[in-house]
Amino acid sequence: MSYTASPCPELVEPCAVHAEGMAQEESHRSQAPPTFYHGASQELDLSTKVYKRESGSPYSVLADTKMSKPHLHETEEQPYFREPRAVSDVHTVKEDRENSDDTEEEEEVSYKREQIIVEVNLNNQTLNVSKGEKGVSSQSKETPVLKTSSEEDEEETEEEATDNSSDYGENGRQKKKEKQVERVRVTQRRTRRAASAAAATTSPAPRTTRGRRKSAELPKRKKRATKEAKAPVQKAKCEEKETLTCEKCPRVFNTRWYLEKHMNVTHRRMQICDKCGKKFVLESELSLHQQTDCEKNIQCVSCNKSFKKLWSLHEHIKIVHGYAEKKFACEICEKKFYTMAHVRKHMVAHTKDMPFTCETCGKSFKRSMSLKVHSLQHSGEKPFRCENCDERFQYKYQLRSHMSIHIGHKQFMCQWCGKDFNMKQYFDEHMKTHTGEKPFICEICGKSFTSRPNMKRHRRTHTGEKPYPCDVCGQRFRFSNMLKAHKEKCFRVTSPVNVPPAVQIPLASAPAAPAPAVANTPTSPAPAVSMSPVGAVLPSRPVPHPFSHLHIHTHPHHAHHLPIPPVPHLPPPPALFKSEPLNHRSQSEDTFLRHLAEKNSAAPAQHH
């Protein structure tokens, strides 16, 4: 001990100084919130009760000069002297202040609920205080922090020091009252904490909510145990189910019902090919597959067109030979098609690009297939062959129309006129003649037609195109029927003259002699045979045909119409054989012509 007992007046000044410093430090450490401030003068006068002295005689006090230091350890013990009555007065003040701090008590209760779990009955009595997951009370883990008697004595000495300092001024007295109120509140908090900790240690372990949850979870563990007990039984059943395997395939089933269903659908109803192992639902599909020998392409019965897949054959029969409707239309020209793929191919026709050009004639096409078809005109190739008669055709549609000869009938027949057709395209064009529909209109003159080929044929009258040339003379024509008529005239031979049976026309060879000029003499046309001798030398000088301006009438009633002018628009017919020209006449030919001239000159004299 650094200080000994001394008279009280000698220690008043240092104690007052230290008490004020301590009060300032304590005000910084713990300041009460403004809502819990109460005036000390209104409730009671602490100066008359806490430090009441009956006699004016001085008493001995041990003061610590280190109290003004900020932090004191709780383990330090401070010796002090006090009056026994002063301690009882302090406790009475504490009991009186308990009723005025209800709001502070509510704050402490909420603070405790956040930290620990407290069970309270209806009378606000604490039943249990626990903390942690296993229901162990928090006091068992952490020992309650109780104030020792030395710490309480230290606080009382501080209060006494502040009481002595209040004698020197009213400001010090006011500060003293505020500090005393704060001290009382701190002690109340500590006592409540100590009481709750003691109750937790002494009370028996009650049944908490967590304990109830644990007891409720026990049956679940039993259920898990039962499940674990059933697990080997289920595994044994699964092993039994896995034994249900299909005899024809490696599939495995859990139940017999699934196995029977699999057998009925897959193996009993499905038709399997013996050669390649392919499966078919219908027997007809299997028979059709076997007809192709599992390798050949599937062929159409009507047109013998081959396909690699069955659905392609169905589409072909539906579109070409059957009942399909053109449901897909072009957005630009409104032309209808059977499938959308045909519409896409048709859309190329509306583009201006023509990248495929013929090397022979220079004509351009939009599709490669159109160029291939066009090239057949130059090459003369006939790639399409009939398997029944080995006849070959240049285009596929020609082969299709030819197949009606072997089938014995044509598939499409008109109900109005009875005309039949090989292809549905021609049948549709023919039906428009009965309905009067003419959807194809000429862009130049506005004339309408039943079919597109007819419209293209009509358009040649405006463009002047002549795509049909004659192989003999090279003349070109606008239509194919005009070329056909021209060929008949080109290869036509005039009919022979009716010669009397007594007259013999010698065909033997004779030395060529210059014949007299026969002009303006009506003669009959010569027979269509070669008059020149064999081995005769052909003249190098071409002479015009002598019969180009003659027309002989053998009938007696028309003898007065002898001189008839030649037809101007018809060219002279060419020679049929590679022989000498007809103006190279022999001697027998000259005598025959002279004889005919004399006979014709005598006939008009008899008529008149």
Swiss-Prot record:
Region spans: Disordered: 61-232
Region (Mediates interaction with CBFA2T3): 497-608
Pfam family membership, one: zf-C2H2
Cellular component terms (Gene Ontology): nucleus
Compartment(s) where it occurs, according to its Swiss-Prot or TrEMBL record: Nucleus
Compositionally biased tracts (Basic and acidic residues): 71-97
Compositional bias annotation for Low complexity: 194-208
Modified residues (Phosphothreonine): T103
Residues recorded as bearing Phosphoserine in the entry: S57, S100, S196, S203
UniProt record similarity statement: Belongs to the krueppel C2H2-type zinc-finger protein family.
Protein name: Zinc finger protein 652
